[in-house]
Curated annotation (Swiss-Prot):
Name the UniProt record assigns to this protein: tRNA N6-adenosine threonylcarbamoyltransferase
Domain of life: Bacteria
Cofactor note: Binds 1 Fe(2+) ion per subunit.
Compartments it resides in: Cytoplasm
Organism: Mesomycoplasma hyopneumoniae (strain 7448) (Mycoplasma hyopneumoniae)
Family matches, as HAMAP family: TsaD
């Protein structure tokens, strides 16, 4: 089964050709350098760039002499995401579908992230997945490949969102996640005196997340230093490292709670754009002594067409088995 997957939910235009369990082609054009000057993604600008970038990707695809007659379906991200970029992706997918007479399959972006763990790996069910991205933070429990349940979700900000906001407050630039993680990697964290930011409280659903309080703590602390002329590069490092340390503790707490709730878990996966974070990846690997741990390559953590194609493949096989 061969699927062409198209992802345009945010600022990455990505197209992949996925055959059975192999990514034959993955072409992605990112816009983060364009949006960096604005401190975040500008939807109208993103839509315009997607139109240009998808044309470039199509030209590259055609240059690879792909036999479109062998493709079984064309999949695209339907939602969630920015309306303009999603529409551009839909129009692009629809045009290919009509021209090559192939079925069109709409795919949920978050479902794509979940299945990104299966692009190069076999998942042993039941699976507990931590999905962390710029717009979402979720714990997903899958009893089997056809039965997925969101057991925990953020009630306010997503993790990637607060990384960006705190990165902006510290003057690190956009996107904040990779910038803060780089600070972590470049400093001797073990011997550093850390700031004691408090962990978020347990919510009505203990598996839900709340990051707004932590965000407020960190930004208020930073602003107080600025107002008293005590803000320095040394403080930027201390705040960034202390923030990430608190995030790691919080994610571990939530994962441990989920594993106590779902006692039959065999596999833990880490997916989504923030899954590229080096220390969060290390955290998930600490569970390897009891569970199978699957973390996709970084190219499959960020938004990509391969995860959309993989989700479509699962969908088609499920329908065939009915």
């Amino acid at each position: 089964m061969k699927i062409l997957g198209i992802e345009t939910s945010h600022d990455d235009a990505s197209v992949a050709l996925f055959s059975e369990n192999k990514v034959e082609i993955l072409l992605t054009i990112s816009q983060f350098e364009l949006h960096e000057q604005f401190g975040g993604t500008v939807p109208e600008l993103a839509s315009r760039e997607h139109s240009r970038n998808l044309a470039i990707i199509l030209e590259k695809l055609l240059g690879k002499n792909i036999d479109f007659s062998t493709i079984d379906a064309i999949a695209y991200t339907k939602n969630p995401g920015l309306i303009g970029p999603l529409k551009i992706g839909f129009l692009f997918a629809s045009a290919l579908s009509l021209f090559f007479n192939k079925p069109l399959i709409p795919i949920d972006h978050l479902l794509g992230h979940f299945w990104s763990a299966a692009i190069e790996n076999d998942l042993e069910f039941p699976v507990l997945s931590l999905l962390i991205s710029g717009g979402h933070t979720q714990l997903i429990f899958a009893e089997n490949k056809n039965n997925l349940e969101i057991i925990g979700s953020t009630v306010d900000d997503a993790l990637g969102e607060i990384y960006d906001k705190i990165g902006r407050s510290l003057g690190c630039g956009y996107p904040g996640g990779p910038k803060i993680d780089l600070i972590w990697q470049q400093n001797n964290v073990r011997n550093m005196e850390l700031i004691d930011f408090s962990l978020p409280k347990v919510l009505e659903n203990p598996l839900d997340f709340s990051f707004s309080g932590l965000k407020t703590q960190v930004i208020n602390y930073t602003n107080n230093l600025k107002e008293n002329y005590l803000f320095s590069q040394k403080k930027v490092v201390e705040i960034a490292v202390s923030f990430q340390k608190t995030v790691i503790k919080y994610l571990k707490r939530q994962l441990d709670l989920a594993l106590k709730t779902k006692k039959n878990v065999k596999t833990i996966t880490l997916v989504g754009g923030v899954a590229a974070n080096s220390e969060i990846r290390k955290l998930i690997k600490t569970y390897e002594n009891k569970y199978k741990v699957v973390i996709p390559k970084k190219e499959f953590c960020t938004d990509n067409g391969a995860m959309i194609a993989k989700a479509a493949q699962i969908f088609l096989k499920f329908n065939e088995e009915k």
